[in-house]
Amino acid sequence: MTELETSIKIDVKTEYIEDQSSPNDERYLFRYTITIINLGKEPVTLKTRYWSITDSNQHLSVVQGAGVVGETPTIEPDTAYQYTSGTVLETPFGVMEGNYGMVTENGEMFKAKIPPFRLSIPGLLH
């Protein structure tokens, strides 16, 4: 990994949204809150996102596009940006991972890796 790639820390919290899910219809809604922390020495701007979402049936969905939740935030050194979004799975368990396409003030582009995280209804996994 490059110095730029290691300057970004990503924390994830997930939540199963039971009241908006319908297991009988194979619809499981999950919310995830992402915190992106800039540990580097210069501002970076989040330009793109890429998600790989796999449910427990090994069905793969890929989501990519500009920014996150309609924004392309600039994250100053020693600060964080947080947002919440969601996804629907056909199974009660899945895994998400991906990356953010970032750019420095000097125009240097790099990818900040989003480590794999679980989406699971409570009590399913021990």
From Swiss-Prot:
GO biological process, one term: error-free translesion synthesis
SUPFAM superfamilies to which the protein is assigned, alphabetical: ApaG-like (SSF110069)
Entry protein name: Protein ApaG
Chain ranges of the ApaG domain: 2-126
Gene: apaG
Pfam family, one: DUF525
